[in-house]
Amino acid sequence: MVRLGSYCEHNGSISQAWLDSGLSPCFYFTLVPSVLLSFSFLLGALQSALYARHSTTMEPKYIPRSRLYRLQIVLSVVLILQSVIGLIWQAAGTDVVYGYMIVHGCLSVVAWGFSLWLLHLERTRALVREKSRGHGVVLLLFWALAFAAENLAFISWQSPNWWWLSRDTVPQKVQFGLWITRYVCTLFLFVLGIRAPGRPRKPYIVLINEDERDVETSQPLLRDPNQSTWQGFKKKLLLVMQYIWPRRNIPLQLLVALCMGLMGLERAINVFVPIYAKKIVDGLTEDSTWNILAVTVCIYVLLKFLQGGGAGTTGFLSNLRTFMWIRVQQFTNREVQIRLFAHLHSLSLRWHLGRKTGEVLRSVDRGTSSINSLLSYIVFSILPTIADIVIGIVYFTSSFNAWFGLIIFVCMTLYLTLTIIITEWRTKYRREMNTRDNEAKSRAVDSLLNFETVKYYNAEGYEVGRFNDSIMKYQVSEWKVNASLAMLNQTQNLIIGLGLLAGSLLCAYFVTENKFKVGDYVLFGTYIIQLYTPLNWFGTYYRMIQSSFIDMENMFELFNEDQEVKDAVNAPALMFRSGKIEFENVHFSYLDGKEILRDISFTVMPGQSIALVGPSGSGKSTIIRLLFRFYDVKGGTIKVDGQDISTVRQESLRSHIGVVPQDTVLFNDTIRNNIRYGRVSATDDEVEEAAAAADIHERILSFRDGYDTQTGERGLKLSGGEKQRVAIARTILKAPQIILLDEATSALDTETERNIQASLAKVCANRTTIVVAHRLSTVINSDQILVLKEGQIVERGRHEELLLKGGVYAGMWQKQQSGSESSSDSDSERKDRTSEKLQPPKATPRRGH
């Protein structure tokens, strides 16, 4: 006959948490399922309500079939069954069932049953606006709490009420077996929960919209502000951590090791500071000798000197560690920026044309600076704080009693849980603020880069208004971020205050009962304040880490951008011989379904010049870009001296090609350095020789600063003709064997064009040349003219031959000739305007006195 005993064994009290050098089984097996059920039911109910309102049923084809998910189900069911089996065995095997056993069995069944329901809910439904993958915060924290609770059993290692010391009886063996089952199951559930095998590998919103992508930029059209910052946490962390260890730099590696050692020493000092404070107080109250007291005080002051202002943030060790870390931090910053800058230059022209430079630079700036912050917060703030918390729990549990360890444990759990929940909720506001900030900065940069256009249309007020709108939107998002931050800080302060109050009252009570000494109260107060000081910053650390991850998201996206045009593994260099160019049945399209070039075939013999003419959009400039390998062809081949350019290294191909584009963009540097960019190792004499060959040497000398004249942003201080001549001089200095002229004179007046043509003739002499021309008069002497229309070559031949055919070329020639007279006057006026940019200094006559 089963007999129902008292609630606790031996008529004990549940309030007696510490019993016989360990946790009371009655207290432990009541507390753990109560906390788990409360957590899973309260927060799980909120999650269920959220899913009921905002979720949609996932299509079966998107739900992964995983054995690991089945293992999650099995482990949860095992935990439910072990609670029932343990209760049944207790009733059948011992004939006595205590109240706490019934409570433990019932609450555990309900808690794990509810977690099983949440697991099924997250597998079959998805939030409409959710872009994160993986399990929700509720399940992850539930499994973490369950596993942490099983680890609390180790505190009772020396207690005879548990199975650690002796497992001679059957009940002890059964209880130990049930604990092993719970420990293994909760451990695997926690690990599997991080992997989330039952959830899609991609966010559901991405799966159902995979076809709705911007082809040009390869970016998802839908961008959700609610995406979890911790999505891809492992990948991000591994990418960041590789910069903390300076490879091939032994001195910096030693600095990293020393910094880690100092950080460990700080943790030990944090324990001894309160202990010596207790010894001083006990020595003063117990009339210790002066010698002992003086030594104790000296040791205490030395420890405080090493530790610093209560939290190890301004002490000798901390300052020494910070000083040694400077070089490591500089190494990290340099490596990230150089690697990212090189990666950006390796991306295709298509990618750069699809991005705003201001936004890219803003993302790079914030991303690189956030990496150092992230490393500092994780290595020197988060890890030490967690270590201090664990050490504090173990110390107070072993040196005081379990109540103090329990108070700290509960406060830490509540603090971390609420911090994570509220901060995750705030993420969307932070991300929105970053987006608005990018938009505002990009709008300002775009407006300033188009300064002349703004002036042409008297649009200053319009631009200021647009910028004001951007700032207003940014400040709305900023207010949400700061308001939610204030709420988080209040929540954290409340939890810390309640924990400090509970511990202080309990310690004071034991002092009045003569169970503790006054020094013990001082030790507790000193230690707990010392512990809570970094804990008070824990929320800030979490927010800053999250903020750093948010700031790095765009930078990681840049790192993840694949090179559209990249060299094959072990690709050889181009073996240049004479400069023969062959296009064989070339097809190309920027977007799928719309071919720009169709079956293009032609050959340029060494030293010959070929002209590409035709209406806008016919594919002339595309041929230039394909030959320079800004893009790879979709079909056919392009050969230089019989070698397919897609199989050779880009660097070797481009070293033999010189380009003079239609819109020459100069660096904001001196004219000398802009010309020298054609060959950075060139001497000043070689630069001036190239300028003379481009017929701009005398013009440069007429400027006040000569070759040291600044060209301004994008070369805006120079006229169009001057910029083109600088570009020609740059190409002459490069001395390429192949010349590509992409409508190099189309934006110039007739007289300037004639002068430029003379300079171009010098550049192209005895070189293979391809010219894209709008004005047919500039290509009449070409060895061959190709007429393109709608991506196809419709005519080819010399100037006279094409005129005799009376086809497309003849029509274009006739049209341009008939309009040449009417445009001559406007050309002269344009010349006058374009030569006004930089004028040589005029002598200023002196006035007489």
UniProtKB/Swiss-Prot annotation:
Domain of life from the UniProt record: Eukaryota
GO terms of molecular function: ABC-type heme transporter activity; ABC-type transporter activity; ATP binding; ATP hydrolysis activity; tetrapyrrole binding
PROSITE patterns per the UniProt record, alphabetical: ABC_TM1F, ABC_TRANSPORTER_1, ABC_TRANSPORTER_2
Positions of the ABC transporter domain: 581-815
Region (Required for ATPase activity): 1-227
Biased composition, class Basic and acidic residues, residue ranges: 827-836
Glycosylation sites: 11
Annotated spans, Required for the lysosomal targeting: 1-195
Cellular component GO terms held in the UniProt record: early endosome membrane; endolysosome membrane; endoplasmic reticulum membrane; extracellular exosome; Golgi apparatus; Golgi membrane; late endosome membrane; lysosomal membrane
Keywords assigned: ATP-binding, Cell membrane, Disulfide bond, Endoplasmic reticulum, Endosome, Glycoprotein, Golgi apparatus, Lysosome, Membrane, Mitochondrion, Mitochondrion outer membrane, Nucleotide-binding, Secreted, Translocase, Transmembrane, Transmembrane helix, Transport
PTM statement from Swiss-Prot or TrEMBL: N-glycosylated.
Function: ATP-dependent transporter that catalyzes the transport of a broad-spectrum of porphyrins from the cytoplasm to the extracellular space through the plasma membrane or into the vesicle lumen. May also function as an ATP-dependent importer of porphyrins from the cytoplasm into the mitochondria, in turn may participate in the de novo heme biosynthesis regulation and in the coordination of heme and iron homeostasis during phenylhydrazine stress. May also play a key role in the early steps of melanogenesis producing PMEL amyloid fibrils.
Family per record: Belongs to the ABC transporter superfamily. ABCB family. Heavy Metal importer (TC 3.A.1.210) subfamily.
Subunit comment: Homodimer.
Protein name in the entry: ATP-binding cassette sub-family B member 6
Organism taxonomic ancestry: Eukaryota, Metazoa, Chordata, Craniata, Vertebrata
Gene: abcb6
